[in-house]
Amino acid sequence: IFGFFQSIEDSDSQLFQDLTIRDTDIDYDIVYVNWDNGTDYIQRNAYVLEEVIKWVNERKAVAGSTEPNVVLGQSMGGLVARYALKDMENDTDLNHDTSLYISHDAPHQGAHIPLGILHMGRHIVNEFIQTPLGNINIPINGTGSYGLSTIDDILDAPAVNQMLINNVDTNGNRT
């Protein structure tokens, strides 16, 4: 959560800072959800979000609040939030009590990574894993180093496979 607050402070947005980290007259409760496994199936993370929304609604009822929820989903979180809200709408026993859903930069029509990049990633992993060098680290744009198995794990993650329009398996076959 420290990283979340730090990113708010670094945002240079006075309004955003007032809403989230400063004591002002603006009266909002912000519930920030960070997934233990963000690359798990979108549906599974949506079910977790449904539980969070139910918890929030229970707390609001105890406090006597009638304010509806505002749900913001960023990137893949937009897909998770959309799925959770629609799933709750489809269940007549559940009420998400949400007046506004904001989707920011979410790949609602799928994500596209050029096939050449996917093939290259798989090829590099396969070439180096099959050599006596073992698992080496590859620097990625100043963000540190990632092991080759990390590249494989990311490309094989359930959510990545759900979002990608085209994908390449470990043998280089399109899926």
Which residues fall in each region the model found?
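Short, surface-exposed "cap/lid" segments of acyl-processing enzymes
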Residues: 1-27, 32
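Active-site loop/turn elements of alpha/beta-hydrolase fold enzymes
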Residues: 28, 33-37, 106
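Catalytic nucleophile-loop/oxyanion-hole region of alpha/beta-hydrolase
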Residues: 35-51
